[in-house]
From Swiss-Prot:
This is Large ribosomal subunit protein uL10. Belongs to the universal ribosomal protein uL10 family. Keywords: Ribonucleoprotein, Ribosomal protein, RNA-binding, rRNA-binding. Disulfide bonds: none annotated. GO terms for biological process: translation. Part of the ribosomal stalk of the 50S ribosomal subunit. The N-terminus interacts with L11 and the large rRNA to form the base of the stalk. The C-terminus forms an elongated spine to which L12 dimers bind in a sequential fashion forming a multimeric L10(L12)X complex. Forms part of the ribosomal stalk, playing a central role in the interaction of the ribosome with GTP-bound translation factors. One of its GO terms (molecular function) is structural constituent of ribosome. GO terms for cellular component: large ribosomal subunit. NCBIfam families: PRK00099.1-1. The gene is rplJ. The keyword Ribosomal protein applies. SUPFAM superfamilies: Ribosomal protein L10-like. Gene3D superfamilies: 3.30.70.1730, 6.10.250.290. It comes from Beutenbergia cavernae (strain ATCC BAA-8 / DSM 12333 / CCUG 43141 / JCM 11478 / NBRC 16432 / NCIMB 13614 / HKI 0122).
Length: 173
């Protein structure tokens, strides 16, 4: 690659590091082109998977202020730049790595913080953002119903007591 081409590639990688919410470094040694295409498909629109040169990646990461890849840039390396939900991308990578052991998840960056491969796997075990928000809303709604019941219970109990007294007086008369 000529120097102007390298400078353009570094600038592009730097911009991808800055604009993505997460980046996951993988080793793809032993994967075929068809398998790499299947990996890109499994990641969907939430991530862009690119095979990159280690030296260019190191320079771009340094320019973007990322030092998480120190010592990780060796061998055939590819990066998944996550633009959408990091959980969905982590699930896609984890599932593909289970089916294809040749894919090795090395490390990553999430919101500017370094994460290990085990943390990426733990991230994949989380439910999606929408599911977590729905569960939180459901729990909040349940607490509101419980509070409403607690506020109305004394009044309804008083009404039932008065009705029971009326019936008792009506039976006595």
């Amino acid at each position: 690659m000529a120097r102007p081409d390298k400078a353009a590639a570094v600038a592009e990688l730097t911009e991808k590091f800055r604009s993505s919410s997460a980046a996951v470094l993988t080793e793809y040694r032993g994967l075929t082109v068809a398998q790499l295409k299947a990996l890109r498909t499994s990641l969907g629109g939430s991530a862009h998977y690119a095979v990159v040169k280690n030296t260019l990646t190191a320079i771009a990461a340094k320019e973007a202020g990322i030092d998480a890849f120190e010592g990780q840039l060796s061998g055939p390396t590819a990066i998944a730049f996550v633009e959408g939900d990091p959980v969905a991308a982590a699930k896609g990578l984890r599932d593909f790595a289970k089916a294809n052991p040749a894919l090795v998840i090395k490390a990553g960056v999430l919101d500017g913080k370094a994460i290990t491969s085990s943390e990426i796997t733990a991230l994949a075990d989380l439910e999606s953002r929408e599911v977590l928000l729905a569960k939180a809303a459901g729990a909040f709604k349940a607490k509101l119903y419980q509070a409403a019941y607690l506020f109305t219970a004394p009044a309804s109990q008083a009404v039932r007591t008065i009705d029971a007294l009326r019936e008792k007086q009506a039976d006595a008369a």
